[in-house]
């Protein structure tokens, strides 16, 4: 493989983690955006998206040399738009060169025409020219020596300066030169069959593929497969305590929604997503005196909170750019990714120092990926999924599971006290997502067992109410048990926790078990029951509607 030197202004293909190569240009980074430590990388601005990121040199390839093979790999609409943007850029640059070339040619033609008109034609003039030619040559020779000597001195100084600024020298390359070289492969290996096939880049001998630095964002993630992301490059930036796995928590003595002793942070708070959980959270933040800017995909949901004193954000990017800490609570991994990486998304508003807290219940791969792209822009990231339901959200009695930037966790103290009774810090990003899925796996399986017990009581001629009374007097007694049984007995399945979401969490928990080769047969069985309930059009009802899967 040949080593190819890259420099400022070069057009390149940037490879970011699992995503397809994307065309971009090496540019100077903003003054307030520092280069990541320990990484040999360039700052690249991507065509078609106007996004940018620090990218390792191993993940960069020259644009022209690899254009054909990259186009064969990716046929997506956005990708083609990006390539078109590059070609338009090249056409404009070429047009400027041609204009400059034409101007020079015109000047040359005018000079030649002038010389032609003044050229001597008679024999006498030719002889005079010949006689004077010797003197002219002599004088020119002397002048040439003087000019050449001065030019040589200046040229030598310029060359010396250029050599000092550039690592390209003859002989053995200096250490710095290695930072500006990338391995160039003549073939593309390991292409996948799909239109969004991942491009396999050759790693350096000293750096395995697993340490790739995936910053890529602003892409149609729904077209790609499950990510295989590594968090090692980011954990150094996140201020977390590796040894803490849940020993730290912020607790309120009682329902913090009615606890007037909370001192709200003076930071500006943003909140994205006003669903069942988000609505209660925002309401409590406002009650406790926080300054909140809200955004929701359906803007009508914002009206009530505007009346309560919240401000309206037109886009997620606007909310993030105008707030110090932005929380988000959406339904699933796809929604979480779209919110961050989509048009006018969170990433567009992230600047150094901006904070993002994702409260969605998603898988560890998704939250790790989001953390990477946020941190790559200089932002701070915390995951903080919540355990509870709509009623607990309204009452400010949620349990918050947090992981990531420890400093940001502490900065969110007053917010967490307003929205929940307890919050736990679980260490590095991904831990909270895993814990949340396990909690919901237990809850979802328990709910399916409750429904199974009630239906079994019915078909065997036993009183369902008596069964509930017995359970409420035993060790299984809980608010959750009583409420869900009451829902079933009354036939009231108004959503407190959507059935489709608990099924989603069960599916993700099963996948988590598969990833570590751990059996989850109970969760798998419960998942099948919820899937049957969804087939019976119960997705938008409460999770207790799983009962109907047993009676149909």
UniProtKB/Swiss-Prot annotation:
UniProt region (Interaction with histone H3), positions on chain: 213-216
Q: Where is this region: Interaction with KDM1B?
A: 215-224
UniProt xrefs under Pfam families: NAD_binding_11 (PF14833), NAD_binding_2 (PF03446), PWWP (PF00855)
Region feature Dehydrogenase domain, mapped onto this chain:
260-552
Please cite one Gene Ontology biological process associated with this protein. transcription initiation-coupled chromatin remodeling
Q: What is its main location?
A: nucleus
Record cross-link Glycyl lysine isopeptide (Lys-Gly) (interchain with G-Cter in SUMO2), residues = 135, 175, 178, 200, 210, 226, 236, 239, 268, 301
Q: Which residues are reported to carry the modification Phosphoserine? A: 130, 166, 539
Q: Which UniProt keywords apply?
A: Chromosome, DNA-binding, Isopeptide bond, Nucleus, Phosphoprotein, Ubl conjugation
The entry's localization annotation reads: Nucleus; Chromosome
MF GO annotations: chromatin binding; chromatin-protein adaptor activity; DNA binding; histone binding; methylated histone binding; NAD binding; NADP binding; nucleosome binding
Give the start-end ranges of region Disordered: 91-187
The residue ranges of the PWWP domain are 8-66
Site (Required to promote KDM1B demethylase activity toward histone H3K4me1 and H3K4me2): residue numbering on this chain:
216
What is a single cellular component term in the Gene Ontology annotation? Answer: nucleus
Q: Which residues bind DNA?
A: 167-179
Q: Where is the composition biased (Basic and acidic residues)?
A: 91-145, 161-181
Q: What does it do?
A: Cytokine-like nuclear factor with chromatin gene reader activity involved in chromatin modification and regulation of gene expression. Acts as a nucleosome-destabilizing factor that is recruited to genes during transcriptional activation. Recognizes and binds histone H3 without a preference for specific epigenetic markers and also binds DNA. Interacts with KDM1B and promotes its histone demethylase activity by facilitating the capture of H3 tails, they form a multifunctional enzyme complex that modifies transcribed chromatin and facilitates Pol II transcription through nucleosomes.
| Protein family per UniProt | Belongs to the HIBADH-related family. NP60 subfamily.
The identity of this protein, by name, is: Cytokine-like nuclear factor N-PAC
